[in-house]
Swiss-Prot record:
Major place of residence: membrane
Localization per Swiss-Prot or TrEMBL: Membrane
Oligomeric form and interacting partners: Monomer.
Cited InterPro entries: Globin-like_sf, Globin/Proto, Globin_bac-like_CS, Hemoglobin_trunc, Hemoglobin_trunc_I
Coiled coil location: none
Cellular component terms per the entry's GO annotation: membrane
Needed cofactors: heme
Biological source species: Nostoc commune
Protein's recorded name: Group 1 truncated hemoglobin GlbN
Family, similarity comment: Belongs to the truncated hemoglobin family. Group I subfamily.
Name of the gene encoding the protein in the UniProt record: glbN
Gene Ontology terms, MF aspect: heme binding; metal ion binding; oxygen binding; oxygen carrier activity
Length: 118
């Protein structure tokens, strides 16, 4: 039985999606200020590992718990929605099926409380 990780193209696909997502974040007027001053190479590596893990790939995320990482950022629902929108769009451009994109976004949504630190 294949996993969501396999179905979306594994590590190379996740890395490409995250790279494209970061380009979108950098030009998004809502999101860019949140990431100002962030080490984006480190953030990229954490995000790739996090997504790989929640998509049933290798257990490689070794960062702090999400709620601790995002404490003090004052992330709100519009921030989450914008990132989810960009993530879904980047997955579609990468050729991930609508079904697998929805499954991936559902898994990210399941983490929303920790992501928004609420």
């Amino acid at each position: 039985m294949s996993t969501l990780y396999d179905n979306i193209g594994g590590q190379p696909a996740i890395e490409q999606v995250v790279d494209e997502l970061h380009k979108r974040i950098a030009t998004d007027s809502l999101l860019a200020p949140v990431f100002a001053g962030t080490d984006m190479v480190k953030q990229r590596n954490h995000l790739v590992a996090f997504l790989a893990q929640i998509f049933e790939g290798p257990k490689q995320y070794g960062g702090r718990p999400m709620d601790k990482t995002h404490a003090g950022l004052n992330l709100q629902q519009p921030h989450f929605d914008a990132i989810a929108k960009h993530l879904g769009e980047r997955m579609a451009v990468r050729g991930v099926s609508a079904e697998n994109t929805k499954a991936a976004l559902d898994r990210v949504t399941n983490m929303k409380g920790a992501i928004l630190n609420k």
